[in-house]
Amino acid sequence: MSEEFPTPQLLDELEDQQKVTTPNEKRELSSNRVLKDIFAGTIGGIAQVLVGQPFDTTKVRLQTATTRTTTLEVLRNLVKNEGVFAFYKGALTPLLGVGICVSVQFGVNEAMKRFFQNYNASKNPNMSSQDVDLSRSNTLPLSQYYVCGLTGGVVNSFLASPIEQIRIRLQTQTSNGGDREFKGPWDCIKKLKAQGGLMRGLFPTMIRAGHGLGTYFLVYEALVAREIGTGLTRNEIPPWKLCLFGAFSGTMLWLTVYPLDVVKSIIQNDDLRKPKYKNSISYVAKTIYAKEGIRAFFKGFGPTMVRSAPVNGATFLTFELVMRFLGEE
C-alpha cells in the first residue's frame, strides 16, 4: 500500500496555485474550491437518485421480504398492485437528502486529501510552505486515499442513516390510501422521532459507509491518476472514461459491503414498537443465517449490482462535468 498516485484535482490546480501569492488569495482559492465541490456533489447526488431509485426500491423489497421471492416476482407484483410510479416511492427524501449526502462525501474527501497533502509536506524539514503546492506531496499513498473516503463515509453516516431509514420504510409500504402507516416523508420523520428511532441503524451505516466509501474513492482516484500519469490533464480525460471509472468504483463498493447493507436494511425496517431484531447486527446476522443460510446476506444482490454501474457512473460523470462547467481546471 505504499504506491503513490497524483491526487486528482490537486495536480490540475497547480497552475492556478502558482499564481497565488498572498494568504488571503490562498484562502479565497480554498473557499471557492470547497463551494464548487459541494455544488458539484449535490448535482451528482440528484443524478444518482433519478437513475437509481427504481433499482433501489426493488433491492429493498427483496432484502426485507419475509418469504423467498425473486426479482421478477417483486417487479411483477409491484407494477400490478401499486403501479409503475411505485418505483419512486420515497424518492422525495433522497432527492433532497442524497444531494446533500453526496456533497458531504465529496467535500470531506477533498478536504482530507488537502489535509494529507499538508501533513506529508510537514514531514519534510527542507520544504517551506511556498513549496507545498509544487512538490511530490501532491501525491498520496493508496492508504491515505482510503482514509479520505472512509472519513467522508463516517461523517456522512449521520445524514445518510435517517434518510435511508425513511426511504426504506416508505419503499416497503405495500398499502395504499388510508391504510398506509406513513403518509409521506414528514409523517415518517415525526413518527420515527416520537418512537426514538430516527437514528436506528446508525452504527451499521457507519461501518458500511466508512469502508465502502474508502474503497469507492480509492478505486476511482487511482484510475483517474493513471490517466493523468499518461500526460493528460483531468479535464482532458474523456467523459466515457470518467463514467466507466465511476461505474467500476461503485461495483467494488458493493462487493465489499453488501452483506452488511442487508443487515442494516433489516434493522431499519424493523417494527418500531416491538422490534424483532433488537437493533443488533449480530442478532440479525444469526437470525437470518439460521433461517435461510448464506443466501440471506445476498438478497437483492442482482438488482444492486445492475444498479451500481449506471448510478455511480452518472454520479462521478455529473460531478466532473459540473466542475468543468464551473471552470475548475
UniProtKB/Swiss-Prot annotation:
Chief location category: mitochondrion
Protein name per its UniProtKB record: Carrier protein YMC2, mitochondrial
Location of the protein in the cell: Mitochondrion inner membrane
UniProt family annotation: Belongs to the mitochondrial carrier (TC 2.A.29) family.
Ranges where the record places region Disordered: 1-27
Further remark: Present with 1050 molecules/cell in log phase SD medium.
Pfam families xref list: Mito_carr
